Amino acid sequence: VSLSPGNREIEIKLRAPDPESASELLLTSGFSIQCERLHETNVLYDTADRKLREAGQMLRLRDAGRRSLLTFKGPGIPGRHKSREELELDLSSARTFEQILSRLGFEPTFRYEKYRTEFGRDDSPGAVTLDETPIGTFLELEGDPQWIDDTAAGLGFREEDYITSSYGRLYLEWCAEQKRLPGNMTWADAGA
């Protein structure tokens, strides 16, 4: 969801101890559930020579319940918040689009899954998602930088808690810590 001006995504992740305490923190801070817990499967695509990755770009196909979404993300801008161009397109059939991507020379390079619950607040210009992944629980705050900073502080987090890495990068770090060979960030592959 692109909540910032134009087609720019501005966000941070925050590590949470577990889904239950993270949900309780949000609910007691005035947030309410906007979209119930939903399983997402995400597949990143690139060319055989990894042109998108080299350019700092990403092409993702997401299946989330009855919704399929194609997302392009441009190179990130360094800073305390993750900021990058984001273009999204709702698809009627992820399977058909997978075939189109294949015919165009794109191949799947990384799969990851998570359970996502979306939270919001009536007076809030931003959104918070609670992501349960095979490598841990995260809160993702998306909106304008001031809203992100104010919301993170209101939830008891400090700027040094901000994570701007992608789930792919976090997964590679997790594999290194666990002394595991990287594969895909799925429940089956992570042994979660």
What name fits each language-model region?
Residues 146, 152-160:
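A hydrophobic, small-residue-rich beta->alpha segment in the mid-to-C-terminal subdomain
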